[in-house]
Structures are given as C-alpha cells and as structure tokens.
UniProtKB/Swiss-Prot annotation:
<dbReference type="Pfam" id="PF07753">
    <property type="entry name" value="DUF1609"/>
</dbReference>
<feature type="compositionally biased region" description="Basic and acidic residues">
    <location>
        <begin position="136"/>
        <end position="165"/>
    </location>
</feature>
<comment type="similarity">
    <text>Belongs to the UPF0329 family.</text>
</comment>
<feature type="region of interest" description="Disordered">
    <location>
        <begin position="136"/>
        <end position="222"/>
    </location>
</feature>
<dbReference type="InterPro" id="IPR022115">
    <property type="entry name" value="DUF3654"/>
</dbReference>
<protein>
    <recommendedName>
        <fullName>UPF0329 protein ECU07_1890/ECU10_0010</fullName>
    </recommendedName>
</protein>
<feature type="compositionally biased region" description="Basic residues">
    <location>
        <begin position="213"/>
        <end position="222"/>
    </location>
</feature>
<dbReference type="InterPro" id="IPR011667">
    <property type="entry name" value="UPF0329"/>
</dbReference>
<dbReference type="Pfam" id="PF12376">
    <property type="entry name" value="DUF3654"/>
</dbReference>
Length: 419
C-alpha cells in the first residue's frame, strides 16, 4: 500500500469510527428517547384537548401547507395523508422543554403540526414562541381576575340591596326621606343596567339582505369584490323551483333528483350569507387558500374554512368550500359554495387538490348572468342574520313567524394561530 493509499485509508477509517461512535452513543439515544417521549405526550395533550372542529382546523392547515409545497422527490408519501416528517434539533427541543416547560414545548409541537419547517426552528424562534405563550397566559390570568372581581361585585351589590330592604321593612310608617331613598334605589338600578348594557354589542344593522350583529360598520375600502354565479343563487330558492331549474339545466349531475334530495342538498348549499365573511377584510383569518387548477377551459381557485352546521337537532362538523373563477373584468365569481360534513379521517380527501379537481363540475357557463355579492338579498320571507365574533362567524336562519326559533346555524371558525 502506497503512502497516498494509506493516508486515504486512515482518513476513511477515522471518519467511520467517528460516525460509528455517534450512531452508537448511549447518551445520544437516551436524549432522543427523552425528546420522543416529550413530543408524543405533547401531541396527545394537543389532540385530546381540542374540540372536533379545532382538530379539523389543525389537520387541514398543516395538510394544506404540505400539499401546496413543491415536491422534492418522486415518493408517494403525500398520498398517505400524513404530514411529512421534519428534521429538528433534538438538543434544542430538550433545552426548550427544560428552560420553559411543557406549555412552550406543546406550542412548538403544535406549530410543527401546522406546517412549520424544522430548519426555521432555532433558539430565536423558541424564544419567540415562549413570549407568545407567556402573553397568552397573562391575558388568561387577567380575564380570570376580572371575572372574579365581577362576581364579587355582584355579590356585594346583592348584599347591599338585601340590607337596604331589611332596613326599609324595619321602619315604621313612611318617613320624609323615603321618596329620596326610592329615587336612590332607582338610580342604582339604572346604573347597573347601563353597566350590563355596556357589554352588549351595537344593535343589528342591515347587511346584504341580512341582519348583521358585530359592532361598528366598517368602511367599504377594505372589502373584497365578488360576484355570485346563478348556480349558487339557485339554492336560495324554494326546493320546487330549484328542482325545476336543475331539470331544465345542462348539468347532468343534478337532473332528475327527487324533491327530498333537493331539500337535503339545499341545507348544505344555501349558505350564501358566507359571502359577507368572504368579502370582509379579515377573510384570510377564516379561509385558507386550497390552490388553483384548470378545468372546463377556465382557471379555478378554491378556498376552504372549518365550520359546523346545526340543523334539525343535529350538529355536523366539516368544511365550507368556495370555488371561484375570474370574469372578463378580473372579478372573482363564486360558482361553488357548500358546507361539506367531514370527519377527522376524511380531511385528507377534502384538501387534496387531485380529489377536488376530479369531483368538481366539468364546465361552468361563464357567460351566465352573475350578481354582485354586495347587492345580494334573500327572497322575501327568509329571515337570517350574521353574527361576527372574535373567533367565529355565524349565519343564523330563523323562523319568520317566530324569530325566537332557530332553523339552522352555520358557524365558520377562525384558522389556528401560526407563529
């Protein structure tokens, strides 16, 4: 063996020895086992602590990011409907757990499930997540303290009223000061009502043919432009009229459907009030981009949001699907709108572009008359209102004869927080 060959051999041997020592390091494998246990426990706590719609949102958000990523190889891991594995520094995770505790570790794991890449998780990011968790805990403590103070205040007011009532009953006859005491009690009562009324939002206002509850009206500057295709507007009509129009139409999938089928489909398709949210400036907080594709000669875009539909004493969780194409002026036209009941196990199909494209309507008549979303008004006799809250948007359909009776309720949930 020449000196040169010997040198190469020794370098290879030294490298193999170092790599072997790394692979068979007991300390390293103990550390990995500890990190795996921490991550598995965090996943368990996350999944068990979420409501069904929250878990759907978590899986949909992470799965959507994975699906839209550029494929790096020819493997079919995506078809398994799992999030791809990520490579993350085990020492960093273990140090974060020891320094900040389980809540921060759990949030780090949640962000990984939401699609955070391992290369983006460094010490700076860990500190940032820890700050978010601390702020969240601080707000929670403040809210708890505020609730306790309000409860104590209510008890003190009730006690004060009771003492005054006893004192009043103990007096004999009417005193000259009685009228002033009655006025004082009346003023206190008015103050209490005003304090309670301060927590109630502004009175309902008319928005797009609906009554909208949700504080101050926003300017139209931040609102988005949308048009509604006739095939979407059709579902706002009576079941008999819907069946008549579908039977005369060109879409084979809807021809010949029974009236009972039409009634069932109307429940999940007649949700045009969702456009009030879709047009708002914070629509991206609720809807996630599900990608674009070409079909039937047009480029189509799809958006989905997690929701729940309450009707007939039942509650279904699923996704709100929105399909659009752009007209000649570049304005998005909503040609597909539906609530799709979805289980945890089938969320992969709902967000898979290939499955969606295959099931989408073949051709949409882009020349059909469309209506501006801001001019949409439900047919006479339909009573519904929209209610916008911090983490959700609700559309409530009521009985026109008895508005205390809720016929249907669609709740659209805000997307999970990505740090």
């Amino acid at each position: 063996m020449s000196e040169e060959e010997k040198k190469v051999y020794l370098e290879d041997w030294r490298s193999a020895k170092e790599w072997g020592g790394f692979l068979y390091s007991i300390e390293r494998w103990e550390r990995i086992a500890e990190v795996e246990k921490i991550v598995c426990n965090a996943c368990k706590e996350i999944c068990l602590g979420l409501r069904e719609e929250e878990l759907l949102g978590l899986l949909a958000e992470g799965g959507m990011k994975k699906t839209l990523k550029e494929e790096f190889s020819e493997d079919k891991a995506k078809d398994a409907r799992y999030l791809e594995y990520i490579v993350v520094d085990d020492v960093l995770l273990l140090d974060a757990h020891r320094e900040y505790g389980g809540e921060v570790t759990k949030e780090l794991v949640r962000q990984m499930l939401l699609g955070k890449e391992g290369k983006d998780i460094d010490k700076r990011y860990v500190d940032r997540v820890a700050g978010v968790v601390r702020e969240r805990q601080r707000k929670r403590e403040e809210e708890t303290e505020r609730s306790v103070k309000e409860l104590v205040g209510d008890e003190e007011k009730a006690k004060s009223k009771e003492e005054k009532a006893k004192s009043k009953r103990g007096r004999k006859g009417k005193s000259a000061s009685a009228p002033s005491e009655q006025e004082e009690e009346k003023k206190e009562s008015e103050v209490e009502e005003a304090e309670q009324g301060g927590e109630v939002e502004a009175l309902p206002v008319e928005v797009g043919g609906a009554r909208s509850k949700g504080g101050k009206k926003k300017s139209k500057g931040g609102r988005k432009c949308f048009k509604i295709h006739r095939r979407v507007l059709r579902w706002t009509k009576s079941p008999e009229k819907i069946k008549e129009e579908w039977d005369k139409g060109s879409e084979e999938r809807w021809k010949g459907r029974s009236l009972e089928e039409i009634k069932e489909q109307k429940i999940v398709h007649d949700i045009t009030g969702v456009l009030e949210l879709l047009r708002s400036e914070d629509a991206d907080r609720f809807f996630m981009d599900a990608g674009k594709y070409r079909k039937g000669g047009s480029e189509r875009q799809r958006m989905v949001a997690i929701g729940a539909l309450e009707t007939g004493g039942q509650r279904m969780t699923g996704v709100v699907e929105v399909g659009t194409f752009k007209d000649g002026d570049g304005c998005p036209v909503v040609y597909h709108l539906r609530f799709k009941p979805t289980s945890i196990g089938s969320i992969g199909d709902v967000i898979n572009p290939g499955v969606v494209e295959a099931s989408d309507v073949g051709r949409v008549d882009e020349g059909e008359e469309c209506e501006d979303a801001d001019k949409f008004v439900y047919p006479k006799g339909v009573r519904f209102e929209t209610v916008k809250e911090t983490g959700s948007f609700q559309i409530v359909w009521k009985n026109p004869s008895d508005t205390s009776e809720v016929l249907r309720r669609l709740i659209v949930y805000c997307r999970p927080c990505v740090i």
